[in-house]
Design a protein with these regions (language model features):
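Alpha-helical scaffolds flanking conserved acidic
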Residues: 8-12, 59-72, 131-135
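Divalent-cation-assisted or electrostatically stabilized phosphate/pyrophosphate-binding catalytic cores
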Residues: 90-104, 158-172
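Alpha-helical phosphate/pyrophosphate-handling elements in metalloenzyme active cores
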Residues: 34-64
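Conserved small/polar residues in nucleotide/adenosyl-binding loops
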Residues: 217-223
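Short active-site segment of divalent metal-dependent hydrolases/proteases
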Residues: 76-77, 142
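Acidic/histidine metal-binding catalytic segments
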Residues: 58-68, 109-121
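Active-site flanking loop/helix segments enriched in acidic
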Residues: 17-42, 85
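Histidine/acidic-rich helix-loop-helix segments that form or flank divalent-metal centers
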Residues: 10, 111-152, 164
């Protein structure tokens, strides 16, 4: 009975700890531009997206596993903080900070629960499985959808260049070519033309099809 109580207390400690994810605010605004979203909202949104959009994955995926991966992958930011997509200095120390955070936070759980969650987070980071690749697609597309809905507000505030977006999204098509192709042609193009994204690449001024250009940023050779 005592062991069962200790197990439950560890689980509840973890559950209380991850409530802090609601206090980690991202740079992306909500669709109505009223405020910035938090990590918990981001995770929930991507989980629903995966349930609805998994049919567009390049490879067959385990939807439940992918949903779980997305729900837990940003928990590390409770300790490590949110690293803005285009913060190069922050990204230099991001992995080290997040690895340490993952070990502490998932370590709050009983070992047989904490270790699988740590492994699931590491699988997402490694990007070697169909689930991890599709999860990355969701992680990159979700803020793009909100930026689109909010009139490109975050892009304008940070003077984001197209080269930065393409660099960040060079692996997005590895999870879903169809979703990336849609986003490239229907979201990025629109916001470049409206001036919300600085077109330092000249991609959309060329007569060649946009998809031909976007493929330059989605292959392993782009690393």
């Amino acid at each position: 009975m005592m062991q069962q109580k200790e197990r439950l207390e560890k689980q509840l400690d973890f559950i209380r700890e991850i409530d802090k994810e609601k206090e980690i605010f991202r740079q992306t605004y909500l669709a109505d531009a009223s405020r910035k979203e938090n990590d918990a909202e981001h995770a929930w949104h991507m989980a629903i997206m995966t349930m609805l959009l998994s049919e567009y994955a390049n490879e067959k995926i385990d939807v439940l596993k992918t949903v779980g991966m997305l729900l837990i992958h940003d928990i590390v930011e409770i300790d490590a903080g949110d690293t803005y997509a285009y913060d190069e200095a922050g990204k230099a120390t991001q992995h080290e900070r997040e690895q340490k955070a993952a070990e502490r936070i998932y370590g709050l759980l009983p070992k047989e629960q904490g270790e699988p969650l740590l492994m699931l987070w590491e699988e997402f980071e490694a990007q070697q499985t169909p689930e991890a690749r599709f999860a990355r697609t969701m992680d990159n597309i979700q803020p793009m959808l909100l930026n689109d809905a909010s009139g490109g507000l975050s892009w304008r505030e940070h003077s984001v260049k197209l080269s930065q977006i393409l660099g960040r999204n060079k692996r997005t098509a590895l999870g879903s070519e169809k979703i990336w192709d849609y986003a490239f042609n229907n979201i990025l193009k629109k916001h470049v033309e409206s001036g919300n994204i600085i077109d330092d690449e000249g991609v959309f001024s060329a007569e060649a099809g946009a998809c031909a250009n976007c493929l330059l940023y989605t292959s392993d050779a782009a690393d």
